[in-house]
Regions:
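Active-site neighborhoods and metal-handling regions in enzymes and metal-associated proteins
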Residues: 1-414
Length: 414
């Protein structure tokens, strides 16, 4: 089945980035491929495909065979996808050469034979081919099956799971602009949620206000479900909103990412219905200094774990170490469900967090969040925990805080 490229003449909405942005990204990847000795790169992870082409879709199931092929020796790319996505692919100007499987259902048994045969027919299976064995995408057994087909055509297959992710860690000026827009939208949405809260309102209704505000500003669903937790649930982590109705005196924590063109900015704040107990306010005031310490002490060129050292030292200094569930963070960028984290974390640990090739450094374009999460089971009125999360954008001047919201506990009436 052929691309319906005539549909591109009917694109009447603004695309996220101009062609030259994608060309610059491909150039970076091709250079990294050459450095790694990879002749051909087959990408099945949607964040990487999106970053290189602008392709976007919502169903990356475990047998999915959507694949972008990148060559080290040429700017030519090749795209494979299912017949069901013919219109989607046809509306992506950066996809110029594609093989559309002419069968349904998606990911038929012969898809990988088609991919291997097509690549061999173009003389592209004689060298080293990189595949993505790690990360969200097709299951490892599916990638192994693809690897077997390529080996059968004479290719040497290597793991290149993070080759593209490592390139997209540091954002371009155009990407940084999108990140700033996502941050502003997130602040606006959190303020809308805060001012809408009132006793008797369910957590799901609070989320509805938050999501509606984000959508009205052009954002879409984030890669992780928004977290809203109130009262006795305020100390929960990674918990979706429930039908619980908020009450006077409750703490309400909201952890959300604004997702604009799939670029994520993470902000969390703890609010209160009425005035919060002074002990909660004291915890947040003492913890807030960890963010100030990052801004004051983290310098360009530092290893990323330096952020962790500085913030955790502040938490120890102000006596909150025993109450902290987690003080830490990770880089952010393009993400698709079910996760907005990647292989790189601030507290770098290769054994625990996957095949991260090296520690990152603080350089312009890096975007990362930082979390202060506290569990307190002392029977204080209002809840079982409080927290905040900030997102930083590193510029030529160092880490810049993106949110303008205070890190104290604002009430619904403030």
């Amino acid at each position: 089945m052929e691309l319906k490229t005539y549909l591109r003449e009917q694109i009447d909405w603004e695309l996220p980035f101009p062609p030259e942005e994608y060309a610059e990204r491909r150039k970076k990847v091709r250079s990294a491929m050459s450095d790694a000795g990879v002749d051909l790169l087959l990408l099945c992870r949607l964040p990487d495909i999106n970053w290189l082409t602008g392709y976007d879709m919502i169903w990356n199931h475990l047998r999915n065979s959507t694949t972008l092929v990148v060559r080290a020796d040429s700017d030519d790319t090749l795209f494979f996808d299912a017949a069901a996505h013919t219109t989607i692919v046809s509306l992506v100007p950066e996809i110029r050469d594609a093989v559309i499987f002419d069968h349904d259902p998606m990911a038929g048994a012969g898809d990988f034979d088609i991919i291997a045969d097509e690549l061999a027919g173009r003389g592209l299976t004689d060298g080293t081919i990189g595949l993505q064995f790690w990360g969200w995408g097709p299951a490892p057994t599916v990638i192994e099956a693809l690897a077997g087909k390529l080996k059968g055509k004479g290719a040497k297959v290597v793991d290149a799971s993070l080759l593209v992710e490592t390139q997209r860690i540091y954002k371009s000026p155009r990407e940084m602009k999108v990140v700033r827009q996502a941050a502003a939208a997130t602040d606006t949405a959190l303020e809308a949620a805060r001012t809408s809260m009132k006793p008797g309102m369910t957590e799901t209704a609070i989320e509805a206000v938050l999501v509606a505000s984000l959508m009205e500003q052009g954002c879409n669903y984030p890669a992780i479900h928004t977290m809203v937790a109130s009262g006795v649930r305020s100390g929960t982590h990674h918990s979706p909103p429930t039908h619980r109705k908020v009450r006077d005196g409750d703490l309400v924590h909201i952890d959300v990412c604004g997702s604009l063109h799939r670029y994520h900015v993470n902000t969390c704040r703890t609010f209160s219905i009425g005035k919060a107990d002074n002990r909660w306010l004291d915890v947040m005031e003492r913890a807030s200094g960890s963010i100030d310490a990052i801004i004051e002490n983290v310098k360009l060129g530092d290893a990323l774990p330096r952020v962790d050292e500085i913030a955790n030292e502040h938490i120890r200094k102000v006596g909150l170490e025993d109450d902290a569930w987690w003080i830490g963070g990770y880089p952010l960028g393009i993400s698709f469900p079910p996760d907005w984290t990647g292989a790189h974390w601030i507290h770098w640990n290769e054994e625990v967090f996957g095949p991260t090739p090296e520690q990152l450094t603080i350089k312009p374009g890096l975007v990362f969040n930082y979390e202060n999460q506290f569990d307190i089971w002392e029977g204080w009125p209002g809840g079982t925990g409080c927290n905040f999360i900030e997102t930083f954008l590193v510029t030529d001047d160092g880490p810049e805080l993106l949110s303008r919201l205070p890190r104290t506990i604002l009430s619904n009436g403030d």
